[in-house]
Amino acid sequence: MSGLAVRRHVGLMACYLLHHRHEPDECGVVFASFKGHDSPLRHRPTLASCHTGGHAIWWTVEAGSEDDALALLPYYVAQRTTITLVSEVQIP
């Protein structure tokens, strides 16, 4: 049974890395879009490169599916976000 199948079988959430990218002139729209979206990601620190010119934001979230993970984001942000199933590893 795969790791994802085991997680689903025992009812645990999968871990996803959400990677959002936007243009420099879209920063205001991206951040403002959260004001109209009820999400546990609001008021929570995350990594972003807007202040250094990269205009990307990353979130690590737990969700039941990719769709559930993207639903944590406002539509405008989710449409510009890639999602990757991830897990922790021990680096030797």
Per-segment meaning from a language model:
Residues 3-92:
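Conserved, structured core segments of small domains
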